[in-house]
Amino acid sequence: MKNWLFVAVVFAMPGLAIAQGAKSCLTPPEAEALVTYALPSVIRAMTTRCTPVLPATTALIQSGPVIAARYQVDADKAWPAARVAFDKISGLDFATTVGEPAAKGLIEVLVGAGLSEKVKPTDCPKFDRIVDILQPLPTKNMAMLITTLMAIDTADRQKKPPFKMCSTPVSGE
């Protein structure tokens, strides 16, 4: 079974994998900042994408806007680190080039559009279940979980992640 959380977040950064330089990698805190910044856009995009196919009583439809608003608080705080991470993998000083508000908006649009392209309506019930299970988690824990799942999902495969994460030493060694 596909890791639907991975699909939902890997979502969203279709152009990042293409633009990323082979030697650029993100540390876990950088990856977590980027994911934290993307979470509200992911939830909003999934809510929009899945509203036509899910019952109104589902967690995503009922709670999606509230979850996105809750995640937005932390996303705003994560922006400076997310910007650095985005610049690192894109090889651009994006916010300086296009301006801070435009950079934020463009990244949010890329995330939402990328997700909408990748998620099929038949995936919506799976994403709804994930949201229902994980919605109590704080944003930081969600970002840590997502980046850890991304590392696991791409570690031994030929999959191309939306961004490369630097390998980290095993704790306790």
Residue ranges and their predicted role:
Residues 32-82:
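Early exported N-terminus immediately downstream of N-terminal targeting peptides
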Residues 24-26, 49-51, 121-127, 165-167:
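Sequence contexts marking disulfide-bonded cysteines in secreted/extracellular proteins
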Residues 135-173:
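Glycine-rich, aromatic-bearing surface loops/beta-hairpins
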Residues 17-21:
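Boundary at the C-terminal end of the N-terminal hydrophobic targeting segment
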Residues 2-10:
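Sec-dependent signal peptide recognition
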Residues 79-150:
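Surface-exposed, polar helix/loop patches in the mature regions of secreted/periplasmic/lumenal proteins
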